Amino acid sequence: MAAPSFKAWRDYAFLQLCLHHVERIEEKLGISGVETTVCSWSRKADPAQGLAGARFDLVLVRRDHVIHLCEIRYSLPPSDLLPAYWQELRERREAFRRATSTKKALQLTLITAHRLDSQALAEDIQCQLTLDDLF
């Protein structure tokens, strides 16, 4: 089992790798021909309003009215914790929708080091990319 400091470094390094390969991510998503704005998004927690903090490190806002909310993680929680993790992603997607008042289609996009089998993926995950897709 890896030390927490190593896991934090590994996740950060993987995030930086992905952010340096956004053009390749767009290509693998099949959107390289679509005008896209690349950004991140976060919202601070507001306990008075009962709002949890939320963040997406990579957001691809497409000219064709679709937004990819990219979840970038080197590894995911163990399979017994995945349902709660998928629920958290749904809540973050809805937080984004409320905070931005967007009418665009929101697609959850998962970028991880290793591919999950289709049974482990939540039905809400529209796209999945792996480390191999970046090279």
Placement of each model-derived feature along the sequence:
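A cross-kingdom feature that marks ATP-driven nucleic-acid transaction machinery
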Residues: M1-F135
